Amino acid sequence: MIIMGIDPGFAITGYGVVKYEGNKFSVLDYNAITTVASMKFSDRLLVLYNELEKLINKFRPDAISIEELFFNKNIKTALTVGHGRGVAVLAAAKSGIDIFEYTPLQVKQSVVGYGRAEKAQVQQMVKAILNLPAIPKPDDVADALAVAICHGNSHRMGALLGNDRF
């Protein structure tokens, strides 16, 4: 199973593509899609959409997992991230590939085993699970890989419980 994880954002959207076979993960690709602050708002969203569409077409994942937004105290930041998230969900939905959404708590629980884990703990586990030489940077990329791992683990649990939705 090929899983694309997306950590949505406006300035930076992290993505990670992993292959999950049996109970082992291997990384196929990971990076960040960035937009330039001087660009028009709509053009930045278009860049994000076009880049995600290219990646989806290149890897043809079996599932796309996206991190849900958590409440942000800065309402303007939350709104701009929300726009980026909407574009990511649209690109995924347009592809016809199943979309799975996970909260940060679910991702931490799945990757680290503790829902209140610190970001550094999640990053270390991503590095270890995927046998990477270093923690992926920026943080958004490690987060995207973590949400992909979360879906792989959820898929395995769903299969064990006889739930074919995953």
UniProtKB/Swiss-Prot annotation:
Q: Which InterPro entries match?
A: RNaseH-like_sf, RNaseH_sf, X-over_junc_endoDNase_Mg_BS, X-over_junc_endoDNase_RuvC
Please give the family membership noted in the entry: Belongs to the RuvC family.
Q: Residues in the active site?
A: D7, E67, D140
Instruction: Quote the Gene3D superfamilies the UniProt record gives.
Output: Ribonuclease H-like superfamily/Ribonuclease H
| Enzyme Commission no | 3.1.21.10
**Positions of Mg(2+) 2 binding:** E67
Coiled coil: which residue ranges? none
**What exactly does this protein do?**
The RuvA-RuvB-RuvC complex processes Holliday junction (HJ) DNA during genetic recombination and DNA repair. Endonuclease that resolves HJ intermediates. Cleaves cruciform DNA by making single-stranded nicks across the HJ at symmetrical positions within the homologous arms, yielding a 5'-phosphate and a 3'-hydroxyl group; requires a central core of homology in the junction. The consensus cleavage sequence is 5'-(A/T)TT(C/G)-3'. Cleavage occurs on the 3'-side of the TT dinucleotide at the point of strand exchange.
Top EC class for this record: hydrolase
Write the protein's name: Crossover junction endodeoxyribonuclease RuvC
Q: Where in the cell is it found?
A: Cytoplasm
Q: Which UniProt keywords apply?
A: Cytoplasm, DNA damage, DNA recombination, DNA repair, DNA-binding, Endonuclease, Hydrolase, Magnesium, Metal-binding, Nuclease
Keyword check for Nucleus, yes or no: no
- Specify whether Cell membrane is a keyword of the entry: no
- What does the record give as cofactor? Mg(2+)
Q: Which gene encodes it?
A: ruvC
Classification lineage: Bacteria, Bacillati, Bacillota, Clostridia, Eubacteriales
Q: Its GO CC terms? A: cytoplasm; Holliday junction resolvase complex
Quote the cofactor binding remark: Binds 2 Mg(2+) ion per subunit.
